[in-house]
Amino acid sequence: MTAVRVYRDDGPLSRALGRTAGGRLPPLPFTVLAAAATGVLLAVGPQPGTRIGPEPAVFAPLVVLLLAGPASDHPHTGRLDWLVPPILRGIEYGYLAVLGDARAVPVPLVYVLLTVLALHHYDAAYRTRQGRRPPRWVRLAGLGWEGRMLFTAFAGLLAPLPFAYAALAAYLGVLSGGESAATWARHGRAGGVMVDLTKKLSEGVGDGPHGEREKRA
């Protein structure tokens, strides 16, 4: 899997559609089309201050999934295919921000969710550049961009949307934050240099001009 495909952060649904298409669909045109469709659906709904319902914005995640998902198995080796992940981030972040604003989700809660997502994506990108890609189970458990969008869209049908935002932020924070901290701690112990400070300090008494004076004393 190429780094660009890792940066996409596809979930199980998008990956399944990608395998069905067999990697034959070019990713960039369909992702741009998905972004345009999301913008249109958000522009016509939801209406501010109303409960989420059968409005066009509810179906935006499904439309994006059907457009961008089938291209997820493409190797993304085209000259401009590196644009696909940031466009998907813009779709996801923009959808969550606009939907939260329209559904009266507290601004701090929207900010927390977007911050958790940004840290999740930054960690995945940094680890990939270091040759330590997140394990497959973490990528699947993270639901992917499509799973998170679908969750927030349809969870509002069963409960107030702030609860969905809070639950998603807490879940991703524990999953990504805990696994990331454990991974870096494990690699730090494996690849770091162990220093015996007590020994170093005792040896340091004889080092340098001050140490020489202490030795002579």
What are these regions (language model features)?
Residues 1-70, 82, 86-128, 133-217:
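Hydrophobic alpha-helical transmembrane segments
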